[in-house]
Amino acid sequence: METEQPEETFPNTETNGEFGKRPAEDMEEEQAFKRSRNTDEMVELRILLQSKNAGAVIGKGGKNIKALRTDYNASVSVPDSSGPERILSISADIETIGEILKKIIPTLEEGLQLPSPTATSQLPLESDAVECLNYQHYKGSDFDCELRLLIHQSLAGGIIGVKGAKIKELRENTQTTIKLFQECCPHSTDRVVLIGGKPDRVVECIKIILDLISESPIKGRAQPYDPNFYDETYDYGGFTMMFDDRRGRPVGFPMRGRGGFDRMPPGRGGRPMPPSRRDYDDMSPRRGPPPPPPGRGGRGGSRARNLPLPPPPPPRGGDLMAYDRRGRPGDRYDGMVGFSADETWDSAIDTWSPSEWQMAYEPQGGSGYDYSYAGGRGSYGDLGGPIITTQVTIPKDLAGSIIGKGGQRIKQIRHESGASIKIDEPLEGSEDRIITITGTQDQIQNAQYLLQNSVKQYSGKFF
């Protein structure tokens, strides 16, 4: 990148007039990624925010948002919503939008980080799990941030380019990480573009994207995302609802919170997995033959510790977050299909041989944990460890004890474990359903623990 790019990237025609009217040929010489930016053209930018950040943008009594409207002669709004997300809408020319974003970014908070920027040597404790990183802790603009841009689904191809050439070039020229989520936001035609990096770079990247999509007409129907239709079962790259137990209120956390900006090979079937910030590729888990049902992580893991099995569940109260974990290990699965009234999953799997354990955790003949990543920091979850995938099966008659009425139980398990959990429909002629779990090793073991407890507690109570 050229040393003068920051000046070209963020011109201020009011205070630095010498940069306000630069010849087009100079801009092309200075920046390899050419843009046909028309500063007089009004465009609309929509950014997906955590609801808790709306107050910082609006300010007390609307002071901040009024100042942005007045100072930049722009339309700026953050409509209210009942969920963990809101949309920041800015209508102005592209250069002005960039200046407004530079004002807004330092006021935002990022979800679920260590309580101190320097506390990177250990995992957060349970009491720290709801702490957030406020960008205001940093001086200047030398810190990493990320924004979620909303675009119409028909515009995605213009950003990706042929075989990903455009998005690759955009990453290289702006020195940002970019992920275009595959699934649309709930009940809409919008897709999320997650852009991360230094604030100046992120803003420059957004300006280039706005320039790209402003030249492309929208194809098909347009249904902008309404955050009131928030639905966490959609893996679209938004924010997930979690609860701050100390304050008794819902807060939003990034759905991406478990992965990085990398790519995962396409899978077969299923919805893209939310825990990873992959590329624009399909992020569905790899599917393999149904393994036999696993037992509780404690005895099972110790029995076959030389195989790629999840470790025992952490001690109660020692997890990243504290939850009511009813149905303690050892409780019986009353009425479970395939087991007698006096038999548990644990007692059944204690008779498994090492080869049976290996078969249970090795779909497609490889490790049950899917280490699909491509360099960089991308494949590692924000709380430590790579993003991995494993599969288990349950008798289809027990699926209701996990899913719950309206899917509430499985949603809660996703919230508590931090893992992505997908339950496939049973194959024709099969009595089992495959559960695919994706996340860090800790998230997977917590998810398995909660799934088993749910079966124990609700077996025989179908909804």
UniProtKB/Swiss-Prot annotation:
PTM remark: Sumoylated by CBX4. Sumoylation is increased upon DNA damage, such as that produced by doxorubicin, etoposide, UV light and camptothecin, due to enhanced CBX4 phosphorylation by HIPK2 under these conditions. Ubiquitinated by MDM2. Doxorubicin treatment does not affect monoubiquitination, but slightly decreases HNRNPK poly-ubiquitination.
Region RNA-binding RGG-box, annotated ranges: 236-273
Cited InterPro entries: KH_dom (IPR004087), KH_dom_type_1 (IPR004088), KH_dom_type_1_sf (IPR036612), ROK_N (IPR012987)
Residue ranges of the region described as 2 X 22 AA approximate repeats: 54-421
Ranges for region 2 X 6 AA approximate repeats: 245-329
Covalent crosslink: Glycyl lysine isopeptide (Lys-Gly) (interchain with G-Cter in SUMO1): K34, K163, K422
A single GO BP: random inactivation of X chromosome
UniProt-recorded name of the protein: Heterogeneous nuclear ribonucleoprotein K
Species of the source: Rattus norvegicus
Taxonomy of the source species: Eukaryota, Metazoa, Chordata, Craniata, Vertebrata
Gene it is expressed from: Hnrnpk
